[in-house]
C-alpha cells in the first residue's frame, strides 16, 4: 500500500521540573493514502501528543515522521510550514475566530496562503455548501450550535485542499446525534475529496463508525494495529479487550462448566447460531455476555456462553467447527473459587 504518513521509531520526552516524562515510546505506524485511520486509547495514553508530532507541532525526540516519503527531521522551518499546508486539523474546541463570520473563517487559511480574495470567497462558499451551511455564511460563531461550529472548522481545515486531515477528539464535546452527523460528514469528505483522515479518540463507537484501520495506544506505546473488524472480532491486547468489551467489571459465581467465547465475523452475526446449536445438539446453554456491532455495514461481535458437562461441551465444539464458527475456550478461574470476570460495555 502507498503510505502517506510513516512513523519510524518515534518517541517524545517532555522535560519537567519533576523529571522526564516519556509521552511516546518507539511508535511505528504506516497510514495508507486515502484511508480513515483511527488511533484510540484511554486518557493520558499519548494520543494527542502523537497527532501533534505528525504535523510537527511537537518535535519528536526520537525517530522521525515521514510525509509522502520525506522525513521531517532534517527540514527547515520553512519546509515544515509547506508540509503543514498539506495537513488540515480539527480539534474538540473548534477554534473559530469570533470576530469573523463563518464565510470569513473559512476564507482565513486561503488568505494566509495568498489566494486572491474573490477566489477564496468562491472556494469558501463551495465548502460551506459541502458541509451543509450555505445559508449561514453571514452568521458568527456565537450564533451557531456546537455541531455547526465543527462543520465550519471542517470546512476551514480542508479549504486549502490538504492531503491529510487530522481529527483530535473532534466529536467528544458533541451529543450522540450531532456526533453521528459529523462522522458522516468526515466520511463523505474522505470519499469525495480523497483526503486521508487520522482520527484520534477515546471512544470505540467513533472507530467503529468510520475507520478502516485502527491503532490502540497504551502507556505511550502501540498495543496493536489492524483492520477495525479484525480487532473488534478478536482483540489481542489487554487494552483492546477493555476498550471493546467495556470497563465495568461484574463478577459472577460459576458453579461449573466450560466457558466459550464465540466470535461473530459479519457473515454469521445475523444467523441464529445459538438457537441452531441448542436445537441441533440438544444441550442447555447459559449466556454470560453478548454484544454485536455494525461495522461498515456488517455485524461483528462476541458471545460468552457457559456449557455444563464434558459431553455437552464436545457436542457444542463439534457443531461450531461444522459451521466454521470461530471460538475460544476461556479460563476465568480465580484461585480456588471458579468465578468469571465479565467486562460489560456502558450503553448510552
Residue ranges, per PLM feature:
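Conserved ABC transporter NBD signature motif
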Residues: 63-71
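Helix-to-loop junction immediately C-terminal to a conserved catalytic motif
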Residues: 55
Amino acid at each position: 500500500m502507498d503510505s502517506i504518513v510513516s512513523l519510524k521509531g518515534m518517541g517524545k520526552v517532555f522535560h519537567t521540573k519533576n523529571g522526564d516524562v516519556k509521552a511516546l515510546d518507539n511508535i511505528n505506524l504506516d497510514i495508507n493514502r486515502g484511508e480513515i485511520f483511527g488511533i484510540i486509547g484511554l486518557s493520558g495514553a499519548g494520543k494527542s501528543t502523537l497527532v501533534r508530532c505528525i504535523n510537527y507541532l511537537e518535535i519528536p525526540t526520537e525517530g522521525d515522521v515521514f510525509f509522502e516519503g520525506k522525513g521531517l527531521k532534517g527540514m527547515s522551518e520553512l519546509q515544515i510550514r509547506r508540509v503543514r499546508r498539506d495537513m488540515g486539523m480539527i480539534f474538540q474546541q473548534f477554534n473559530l475566530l469570533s470576530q469573523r463570520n463563518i464565510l470569513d473563517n473559512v476564507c482565513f487559511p486561503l488568505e494566509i496562503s495568498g489566494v486572491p480574495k474573490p477566489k477564496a470567497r468562491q472556494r469558501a462558499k463551495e465548502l460551506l455548501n459541502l458541509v451543509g451551511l450555505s445559508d449561514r455564511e453571514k452568521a458568527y460563531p456565537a450564533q451557531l450550535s456546537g455541531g455547526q461550529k465543527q462543520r465550519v472548522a471542517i470546512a476551514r481545515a480542508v479549504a486549502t485542499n490538504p492531503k491529510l486531515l487530522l481529527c483530535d477528539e473532534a466529536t467528544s464535546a458533541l451529543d450522540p446525534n450531532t456526533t453521528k452527523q459529523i462522522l458522516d460528514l468526515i466520511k463523505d469528505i474522505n470519499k469525495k475529496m480523497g483526503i486521508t483522515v487520522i482520527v484520534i479518540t477515546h471512544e470505540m463507537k467513533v472507530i467503529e463508525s468510520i475507520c478502516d484501520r485502527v491503532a490502540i495506544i497504551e502507556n505511550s506505546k502501540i498495543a496493536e494495529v489492524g483492520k477495525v473488524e479484525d480487532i473488534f472480532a478478536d482483540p489481542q491486547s489487554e487494552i483492546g479487550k477493555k476498550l471493546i468489551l467495556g470497563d465495568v467489571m461484574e463478577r459472577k459465581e460459576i458453579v461449573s462448566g466450560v466457558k466459550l467465547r464465540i466470535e461473530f465475523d459479519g457473515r454469521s452475526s445475523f444467523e441464529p447460531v445459538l438457537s441452531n446449536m441448542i436445537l441441533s445438539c440438544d444441550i442447555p446453554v447459559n449466556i454470560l455476555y453478548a454484544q454485536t456491532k455494525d461495522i461498515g455495514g456488517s455485524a461483528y461481535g462476541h458471545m460468552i456462553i457457559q456449557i455444563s458437562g464434558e459431553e455437552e461441551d464436545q457436542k457444542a465444539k463439534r457443531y461450531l467447527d461444522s459451521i466454521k464458527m470461530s471460538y475460544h475456550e476461556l479460563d476465568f478461574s480465580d484461585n480456588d473459587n471458579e468465578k468469571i470476570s465479565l467486562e460489560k460495555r456502558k450503553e448510552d
